[in-house]
Structures are given as C-alpha cells and as structure tokens.
Amino acid sequence: MDGSGKGNLDQVKHVLLVLSGKGGVGKSTITTELALAFRHAGKKVGILDVDLCGPSIPRMLSVGKPEVHQCDSGWVPVYADPQQQQLALMSIAFLLEDSDEAVIWRGPKKTALIGQFVSDVAWGELDILLVDTPPGTSDEHLAVLENLRKHRVDGAVLVTTPQAVSTGDVRREITFCKKTNLKILGIVENMSGFVCPHCSECSNIFSKGGGEELAKLTGSAFLGSVPLDPLLTESLEEGRDFLQAFPESSTFTAISHIANTLLNSLNA
C-alpha cells in the first residue's frame, strides 16, 4: 500500500492525541467516552488505537474481532455503529489471531505498523480523529507525530489521576509536548472522587485537585474532572454506551462538559 498519509487524512477535519505519562490512569476510557460524546453531539468520529501492547478500546466499544478489509484507498476501519457509521475504529487488536497474544516487537516494527495505521486507513470524512497512545513517551509517540506531520494536528489531551505520582509523570509528558511542538489542549483529571452506586454521592478516596493544580502550574487549560463511577466501569466492561444509558448521572455531566469544551476550542 503506497498511501501518502495525507491522502487518507484529507477529509479529517481535526486530529487529537490522547496522552498520559503513566499507565492505569484511564486514558483509553477517556478516549472512548470522548468519542461517544462527540458522536452524540452529531460529529463523525474515528479512533486510531496505537496502544500496541494494550489495545483495550475494541472491547470497550464491543466491536468483537471483525476482519479488517481493504479497499482501493487502504484498510477499511471497523464501525462501532455499523448502521449509522458515525464512529470508526482501527486497532492492532483486529490484526491479532488470538486476543491473548502478546505483542513483543522491537521499536522499528512498531514504528512501521504505526506508519501504516496513519497512512493506510481509509477514514473517509471525519469531524474528529482521536489517537489513543500508550503511556509515557516512546517510539510509538514519535512515530505518530512523524507520520502526522503532513496533516495538521490540533493538539493533545493529557490524562492524569489526582495523585502526585501521576501528575509528576504528566509533567514529563508536558515537556515532551513542548519539545515536539505539540499543542496542549488541556488536562483531564480522571478518577477524581468515587461515586457511590447506592446514593450517587461522590467521596474522595484519593487526593483531589492534582490535575487542576498541575494545569495552573504549567499554564495549561484544565478541561475538567471525571469521577470513578462503578456504572461507567460496568458499561465499559460490557461494551455499552454509558452516556446513552445514564444521562442523569454526574459522570455524564462531567464527560459532556469536557467534550463540549474541546468542541468549542476546535470550533467543530
């Protein structure tokens, strides 16, 4: 496939990277929920899952393990909503024969696959493409940015939890963004409080406000906080649309606020 990268992204209006300095902070959760929120706002959305060693988004969207087909323009993405075709996804999970198979690859092979993902997926018309990256700053991140140079990247959303150990890692992620001239669209504090499944009261089981404080210290925008909600966790495990199922929840309000803030900043 000799896609140029730019050709298959020509009809993509906005590209957002979702980054985290540390694993386990819920980066893929935020990516998934933002994609669903954008779709509910009437946008056509794509997710490029380049977390090669831990591709979890196909399960969160309950797309199973479909075959990836090719057309004249390249790989055809998988749709989480085959009828409406408003939410497209491409992930290495679709290319593995066994879902339990470990991806034990050296940097050059990872870089080559990411290059294919960026250049050879026939997204068609998209309002927003979300790129879900692995934690840290690695070959994968550099490969994504290098392959997206021909296309304008709007910026990055950084995900952290409230604890100092997580915000410390995000500081390094901010340094990475500055060194690579990647605009920071804002910081999301995930797992900010725990929503009781019985009374819906939110209690702080971790420290609180670390993400907002980090945003102030680094001059970044603070997009908002998302609580640790058992209903959200259950929805992701079952591949259900949390935003559609629980529109009365405070977590719905938090995610919708973050999504709307991003849409406004993009003028999307």
Swiss-Prot record:
Disulfide bonds: none annotated. Keywords: 4Fe-4S, ATP-binding, Cytoplasm, Iron, Iron-sulfur, Metal-binding, Nucleotide-binding. [4Fe-4S] cluster binds at C196, C199. It is found in: Cytoplasm. GO terms for molecular function: 4 iron, 4 sulfur cluster binding; ATP binding; ATP-dependent FeS chaperone activity; iron-sulfur cluster binding; metal ion binding. The keyword Membrane does not apply. InterPro entries: Mrp/NBP35_ATP-bd, NUBP2/Cfd1_eukaryotes, P-loop_NTPase, YlxH/NBP35. Heterotetramer of 2 nubp1 and 2 nubp2 chains. This is Cytosolic Fe-S cluster assembly factor nubp2. The lineage of its organism: Eukaryota, Metazoa, Chordata, Craniata, Vertebrata.
